[in-house]
Every structure is written in structure tokens, then in C-alpha cells.
């Protein structure tokens, strides 16, 4: 299998991290859609240029789940079930348990590339988002034993395009 370059991204969660990812990707010419249960956060993120209101009109190449860790497993699994060809990554701070929970939900973990940017600010929400938030920051990728290597490389390329330094580690 040879994956085409990632050109379209759906970000689920438009807080500080999700909106910052969207802003950075859009400055690099990517098509970005946003989804968020919080309509106010979504509106602010769209106004700040983080992306277009989703869902996308076609399957995205990449889904980035940027929601609180407590709901991340179910949102990741739902994304893997909904977008059958997309690679799915996340930004949650916990990894080993999250990966077990995603797998227990019957999701295709070969397409799941867990990640966590070591970046943030003293303020939260999409109003505080910055396109340069990830510049020179470590972004850990923690692929599981069944994660597809090409998908991991594709996510690493996107992360590096944000100016982040990719570190691959175990969950």
C-alpha cells in the first residue's frame, strides 16, 4: 500500500490545541474542517481561520482528535468507524490505556497513530490559538504494535510541517 500525501484534515475539537493545529495546517495550504460539540468554540475557531465547519463533504485523509482524554477513546473509535480510509491521530496526554480502550471498542487500530504535542499556553480555548504553537516543540508519536508504518510516517510528516520535532516512543 502506498498512501498519497495528506491534503485534507478533519480536526475534532476546536480548543487551543485543535484550533492551533488547524491554523498551522491552513497556512501550509491544507484543507481543514472542524467539528466540536461546543458551538461557541467552533465559531471562534472558524473566525480565527482554523478551518471550515465540518463534517467534510468527502472523507478526510487525516482525522486529528483534540478532545479531553476522558472522551478521546470513544471519539477516536467513532472516527475510525466513520472514515474508513482515513488515518486517525490524537493529542491526548495519556496513551497506553487510551490505545487499549480504542482497540476494545472494535476500531481498526492499524489506522490509529497516537500522538501528543508537548505544547500549550497559560490560557485555553480557540481565542488563544496560535499557528506557531508547535514550532520547535516535541510531538510524541506512540504507534502501537499493529499501527501501519506508512500511516505513522504520514502523520510524522504532517507534524513536522508544523515545525514540531517528532519523537517516537512507546505508549
Where do the PLM segments sit?
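NAD(P)+-binding Rossmann beta1-loop-alpha1 motif at the extreme N-terminus of oxidoreductases
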Residues: 1-54, 62
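N-terminal Rossmann-like NAD(P) cofactor-binding module of classical short-chain dehydrogenase/reductase
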Residues: 63-64, 89
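Internal alpha-helical scaffold of NAD(P)-dependent oxidoreductase catalytic cores
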Residues: 133-171
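Residues at the starts of beta-strands that form the adenosine-phosphate
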Residues: 8, 31, 111, 138, ...
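Phosphate-coordination loops involved in phosphoryl transfer and adenosine-cofactor binding
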Residues: 5-8, 60, 85, 136
Amino acid at each position: 500500500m502506498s498512501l498519497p500525501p495528506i491534503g485534507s484534515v478533519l480536526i475534532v475539537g476546536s480548543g487551543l490545541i485543535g484550533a492551533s493545529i488547524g491554523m498551522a495546517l491552513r497556512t501550509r495550504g491544507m484543507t481543514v474542517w472542524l467539528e466540536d460539540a461546543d458551538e461557541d468554540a467552533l465559531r471562534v475557531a472558524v473566525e480565527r481561520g482554523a478551518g471550515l465547519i465540518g463534517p467534510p463533504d468527502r472523507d478526510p485523509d487525516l482525522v486529528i482528535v483534540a478532545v479531553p482524554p476522558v472522551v478521546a477513546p470513544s471519539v477516536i473509535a467513532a472516527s475510525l468507524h466513520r472514515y474508513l480510509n482515513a488515518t486517525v491521530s490524537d493529542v491526548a496526554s495519556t496513551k497506553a490505556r487510551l490505545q487499549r480502550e480504542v482497540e476494545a471498542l472494535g476500531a481498526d487500530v492499524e489506522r490509529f497513530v497516537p500522538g501528543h504535542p508537548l505544547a500549550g499556553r497559560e490560557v485555553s480555548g480557540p481565542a488563544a490559538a496560535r499557528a506557531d504553537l508547535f514550532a520547535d516543540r516535541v510531538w510524541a508519536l506512540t504507534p502501537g504494535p499493529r499501527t501501519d508504518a506508512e500511516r505513522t510516517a504520514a502523520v510524522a510528516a504532517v507534524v513536522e510541517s508544523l515545525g514540531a520535532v517528532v519523537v517516537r516512543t512507546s505508549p
